[in-house]
Amino acid sequence: MSDLKFSIITICYNSSKTIERTIKSVLAQSYTDFEYIIVDGASKDNTMDIVKRYEPLFEGRMKWVSEPDKGIYDAMNKGIRMAQGTIVGIVNSDDWLEPNALQILADEINQDPSNREKILTGEVVFHYEDGSTQLYPTTYERYEYFAKRYRMGLNHPATFVPRSIYDRIGVFDERFKLYADADFIIRCYEAGVGVHFIHKVLSNMADGGASNVRSRRELDDSLLKYKKHCKTKSEYLKYATKARIMWFLRYFVPEWYVRLYRQQHNKK
């Protein structure tokens, strides 16, 4: 389909150590009908110098803005509003795409045009700081299991959303600091939005991103998420109590155990 255009969005702030890899991964795409949108939060390092150096290589397919924002999801929403493509993907400044990621997505849509109106999601390879990796698979069963428990059931770095779904469901809820992507996917699940699962690696994610940092914000976002989505007060109390206990215990659990738990948890 000649009118199938992708909008790839990268948000960044002081990302000079990682953003070049991200930019190169977009530039290397074998499918070339895309626009690349970079939303920078007025970085104080040389992030924008790197962006400007690569801009000519995109031959008019890159656009960027560099200005203060109100947080991660304000920046993402800004990028979505700038997007003109049919399908929108968010590739953060410490993530990078596989070279054939967009071609795989285009093939899936060309083979079944109904996929144009569905969320498309694939597999992610998570890269730990010690050099080890973990494959995060994607299945409907896993998606449903987590969505029913108000949790993120898709690999966000490998998830691509039709612009029409953002128009229908809405963009990211900026009250969240860490979990607006999970909230968005839960809203899609509750609204019956279709999801097409691709059992191929589309993206890579490095350890150390904002969602991987343990903090009070994590608990606050969990409580907001449960308050927003739980159907009854008793259900909210159940999940909120568990969230508070888990957040407290994590400060007394060694990092290796947290990592092991995360790996086992995502095999379900």
Residue ranges and their predicted role:
Residues 139-218, 222:
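Conserved nucleotide-sugar donor-binding catalytic segment
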Residues 88:
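Short aromatic/hydrophobic "clamp" motif used to bind/position activated sugar donors
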Residues 46, 74, 95-108:
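Acidic donor-binding/catalytic loop of UDP-sugar-dependent glycosyltransferases
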Residues 33-42, 63-67:
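Short beta-strand/loop segment that forms part of the nucleotide-sugar
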Residues 65-83:
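Glycine-rich, basic loop-to-helix element that forms the pyrophosphate-binding segment
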Residues 1-28:
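N-proximal low-complexity "stem/linker" segments adjacent to membrane-targeting elements
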Residues 32, 40-49, 92:
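A conserved acidic beta->alpha catalytic loop
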Residues 100-134:
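Conserved donor NDP-sugar-binding/catalytic core segment of glycosyltransferases
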